[in-house]
Amino acid sequence: MSNTPIELKGSSFTLSVVHLHEAEPKVIHQALEDKIAQAPAFLKHAPVVLNVSALEDPVNWSAMHKAVSATGLRVIGVSGCKDAQLKAEIEKMGLPILTEGKEKAPRPAPTPQAPAQNTTPVTKTRLIDTPVRSGQRIYAPQCDLIVTSHVSAGAELIADGNIHVYGMMRGRALAGASGDRETQIFCTNLMAELVSIAGEYWLSDQIPAEFYGKAARLQLVENALTVQPLN
C-alpha cells in the first residue's frame, strides 16, 4: 500500500476532437445530432475536445457550450484558441485550454551498422480468437491486434500497430493509436461504426458504399484515409 494519498502518473487517452467550422450554436447542435445518430454507441455521452482554430466569426461561447452539451457530448477542453477574449470566456467556465502536440522534426538517419550476430527480430501481436461483444474494449499496446472472430456493434478495437479482423467487423477499429501513420486496418467484412488510423477517421456513412460489407484494407495515403479491396 502506498504511503501517500495520491500518485501522479502520465497517461494517454483516445479522444474525439470536434473541429468547429461554424460560429452559430444551432447549426453546430444539429450537425452533432446528425453525427451521433450515425454512430450512437461511439459518440453518445463521449468526452470530446472542441477545436476552434477554424472559427472566423465571433462566437457566443456560453451558447456554443450549451449547444454541444445538449447533444450529450461532454466537453473536457478546448484547443486551437488564439483569441484572448475567447480564451478568457472559456477559462471562466472552468474549461482548460489545451495545446495540441506538434509534429517532431525528422531525425537524421543513423549510421548503418553491421547486424548483431544470432539475433532474431520479434514482432509482438495480440491475438483474440473469441467474439468481441458490445461494450468490450480491446487494446494492443505497441503491437498489432488480430481478431479471428466477429466484432459486435459497440465494441472497440485499439492498437498501436495494425488491426486485422477475420470476421464481421461491426464495431470500432482504431489503429496507430500512438500516432504511427504507417499502420493499416484489414477486414474480411467491413461494416464498422468507425475506422481510424492515427487519428484520421471515417464514420460508417463515410465508408465508400462499394466497400461496405466487403473485404477491405484501409491505410493513409498523403495523410488521407483510403480503402481498397483486400486481395
Swiss-Prot record:
Keyword Membrane recorded: no
Record organism: Escherichia coli (strain K12)
GO biological process, one term: regulation of cell septum assembly
Role, per record: Cell division inhibitor that blocks the formation of polar Z ring septums. Rapidly oscillates between the poles of the cell to destabilize FtsZ filaments that have formed before they mature into polar Z rings. Prevents FtsZ polymerization.
One MF annotation (Gene Ontology) recorded for this entry: enzyme inhibitor activity
Classification lineage: Bacteria, Pseudomonadati, Pseudomonadota, Gammaproteobacteria, Enterobacterales
GO cellular component: cell pole; cytosol
Keyword Cell cycle listed: yes
UniProt keyword terms in alphabetical order: Cell cycle, Cell division, Septation
Assembly mode: Interacts with MinD and FtsZ; homodimer.
Null allele phenotype: In a minCDE operon disruption (minC-minD-minE), cells divide not only at midpoint but also at their poles, yielding small minicells and long rods. Loss of polar localization of several polar-localized proteins including GroEL-GroES, TnaA and YqjD.
Family label: Belongs to the MinC family.
Identification of the protein by name: Septum site-determining protein MinC
Top-level division of the source organism's lineage: Bacteria
Region (Disordered): 101-125
Biased composition (Low complexity): 114-123
